[in-house]
């Protein structure tokens, strides 16, 4: 069924769907700016197909850049973790995938569980503006958040006690560096959703939510993740 004209106008006011894709999250997007792939690319193209408009992809390398593009109206949709700070400026669908934030530490560290991290004198490396940066900034009371181009970059450059990151890439990082280990359990569950500007027509936001919920429920998201070789949890 074609989307109502009101929805098309609200979500694609320039006659194309401008979608911002974060290549910095390898679970959700892969490839190059010239040839991106992954579940977020598939979702963008499917939303565009249902709207009946072409899709223009803008690729960035950090969630904060995706957020800025959507919040400032330079992109019509983006793919972001649901966070209270972001929800003040963008409208979210329900999550289409769940990923985990985990810590990594040296093998000899006294940190045994995620709860051990929040102590005075502990410094945690994070990717600036990432979902887990926002979460840890909001929740840590004693440990210090140190931001960098990536949590592992900050961890190495500043000889930090802890690195934070998304489970899949952080696990791969640890696997190539003897002397490090991943801390279990996760410290947060990251709820990835589709975002659009909070000023968009409520009917269009509701339509987008329905579409994403349907694509999550009918196996579209799971199939896309499988094609891209990603192991992530689909809600429901």
What is the predicted role of each segment?
Residues 64, 68, 80-89, 135-138, ...:
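A ligand-binding cleft/hinge motif common to bilobed small-molecule-binding domains
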Residues 23, 97-107, 171-213, 229-236:
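Periplasmic-binding protein-like
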Residues 2-81, 86-88, 218:
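Extracytoplasmic small-molecule ligand-binding "clamshell" domains
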Residues 94-96, 105-123, 206:
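Flexible hinge/capping segments at coil-to-helix
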Residues 16-23, 27, 37, 115-132, ...:
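Short loop->beta-strand "edge-of-pocket" segments that line small-molecule binding or catalytic clefts
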Residues 56-68, 111-112, 144-157:
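Short helix-initiation/N-cap motifs at beta->coil->alpha
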Residues 29-33, 44-54, 93-94, 118, ...:
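Ligand-binding cleft/hinge of the Venus flytrap
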Residues 1-10, 131-148, 213-236:
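Ligand-binding clefts/hinges and TM-proximal coupling segments of bilobed small-molecule sensing domains
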């Amino acid at each position: 069924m074609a989307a109502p004209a009101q929805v098309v106008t609200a979500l694609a006011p320039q006659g194309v769907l401008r979608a911002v894709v974060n290549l910095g999250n390898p679970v959700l997007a892969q490839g190059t700016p010239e040839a991106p792939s992954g579940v977020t690319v598939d979702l963008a193209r499917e939303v565009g197909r249902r709207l009946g408009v072409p899709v223009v992809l803008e690729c960035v390398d950090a969630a904060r850049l995706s957020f800025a593009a959507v919040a400032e109206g330079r992109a019509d949709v983006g793919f972001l973790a649901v966070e209270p700070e972001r929800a003040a400026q963008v409208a979210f669908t329900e999550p289409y995938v769940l990923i985990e934030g985990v810590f990594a530490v040296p093998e000899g560290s006294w940190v045994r569980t995620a709860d051990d991290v929040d102590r005075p004198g502990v410094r945690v490396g994070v990717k600036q503006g990432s979902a887990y940066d926002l979460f840890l900034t909001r929740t840590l009371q004693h440990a210090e958040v140190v931001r960098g181009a990536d949590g592992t970059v900050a961890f190495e450059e500043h000889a930090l006690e802890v690195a934070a990151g998304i489970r899949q890439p952080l696990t791969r990082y640890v696997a190539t560096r003897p002397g490090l280990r991943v801390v279990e359990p996760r410290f947060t569950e990251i709820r990835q959703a589709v975002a659009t500007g909070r000023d968009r027509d409520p009917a269009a936001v509701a339509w987008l939510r329905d579409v994403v919920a349907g694509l999550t429920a009918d196996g579209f998201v799971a199939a896309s993740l499988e094609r891209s070789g990603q192991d992530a949890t689909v809600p429901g």
